[in-house]
Swiss-Prot record:
Cofactor entry: FMN
Protein name: NADPH dehydrogenase
Subunit structure: Homotetramer.
Biological process according to GO: response to toxic substance
Catalytic activity of the protein: A + NADPH + H(+) = AH2 + NADP(+)
EC number, UniProt record: 1.6.99.1
Source organism of this protein record: Halalkalibacterium halodurans (strain ATCC BAA-125 / DSM 18197 / FERM 7344 / JCM 9153 / C-125)
First-level EC class: oxidoreductase
Length: 338
């Protein structure tokens, strides 16, 4: 039987050598607070590429300084960021992996000095209260995502992911729990989708490569979006040309989350089948057998691995051995891998 985890995957002309994706995870390591790539980032991402991950997604990268989660986040709001990102892409490509970047804005969850912005002036838990965005600020943010995509293209990335999850700005617009606007960007689901729809459209004016969106497909709170809402959103995104939905969950408001191995896989499965769009499964996927089951049963198209790759950069090899197969690695490691 073919091991689907190690089969190739083609998306809009980009071929991934396997179905293993390094999920975007903030490293908070831009220690000069300028959003620039540091040596740690390069070694961090290159080591996972050497470990034979098929697609590396660089962590949430802020499209504006105000859109950072912390002062130590990566940024893509300036052309000064391009050279470091270019080197990162080159080091990822050197090992046969493809490179993606997650474009992000933290919204009300930005832990920064000065004012922060969100769809409505509602704080997250005990954090700072944001300013409700003006229409001018909304337009500026949409433009910032477009310019971020253009810089990502110049840096050589193969894929872009838009961060629409975990209670950050786009998620805040999507959710009725955080979006209390009475203008064209609030109210109905269609209106709450307007920001993301316009961001997608603007990015597509400068980027014709694969485009993913990460969503929190469960909000775990009364009055929030339901899975049926996210299926509708996924259908709209497919019509716009989105290639894959990365299905995470939670964090739009403080709420208990029932966590167990593969707990978010049913979200990816439902959206894949109901919206007829490719999905990525993420969340406590820790073994090759578990990942293979998800793919063989057509519950998702790609496997996004997060903390397991922090623990073990060579997890793909471990997964292969568990499945009774072998994969190649850096020739320098042959005496250990063969």
């Amino acid at each position: 039987m073919e091991h689907k985890l190690f089969s190739s995957y083609v998306v809009k002309g980009v071929t991934l050598k396997n179905r293993i994706v390094m999920s975007p995870m903030c490293m908070y390591s831009s220690d000069q607070k300028d959003g620039k790539i540091r040596p740690f980032h390069i070694s961090h991402y290159e080591s996972r590429a050497a470990g034979q991950v098929g697609l590396i997604i660089v962590e949430a990268t802020a499209v504006t300084p105000q859109g950072r989660i912390s002062p130590y986040d990566l940024g893509i709001w300036s052309d000064d960021h391009i050279s470091g990102l270019t080197e990162t892409v080159e080091r990822i490509h050197a090992h046969g992996a493809k490179a993606a970047i997650q474009l992000a804005h933290a919204g009300r969850k930005a832990e920064l000095d000065g004012p922060i912005i969100a769809p409505s002036a509602i704080s997250y838990d005990k954090m700072k209260t944001p300013d409700a965005m003006t229409e001018e600020q909304i337009s500026e943010t949409i433009e910032a995502f477009k310019l971020g995509a253009l810089r990502a293209k110049k840096a050589g990335f193969d894929i872009i992911e838009i961060h629409g999850a975990h209670g950050y700005l786009i998620n805040e617009f999507l959710s009725p729990l955080t979006n209390k606007r009475t203008d064209a960007y609030g109210g109905s689901l269609e209106n709450r989708y307007r920001l993301l729809r316009e961001i997608i459209s603007e990015i597509q004016t400068v980027w014709d490569g694969p485009l993913f969106v990460r969503i929190s497909a469960a909000e775990y709170a009364e009055g929030g979006n339901e899975l049926s809402d996210f299926i509708t959103l996924a259908k709209w995104m497919k019509k716009q040309g989105i290639d894959l939905i990365d299905c995470s969950s939670g964090a739009v408001v403080p709420a208990p989350i029932p966590v167990y191995p593969g707990y978010q896989v049913p979200l990816a499965e439902a959206i894949r089948h109901e919206a007829n769009i490719a999905t990525g499964a993420v969340g406590l996927i820790t073994s090759g057998i578990q990942a293979e089951e998800i793919l063989q049963n057509e519950r998702a198209d790609l496997i996004f691995v997060a903390r397991e790759l922090l623990r073990n950069p060579y997890w793909p090899r471990e997964a292969a051995l568990e499945l009774g197969t072998t994969i190649s690695g850096p020739s320098q490691y042959d005496r250990a891998w063969l």
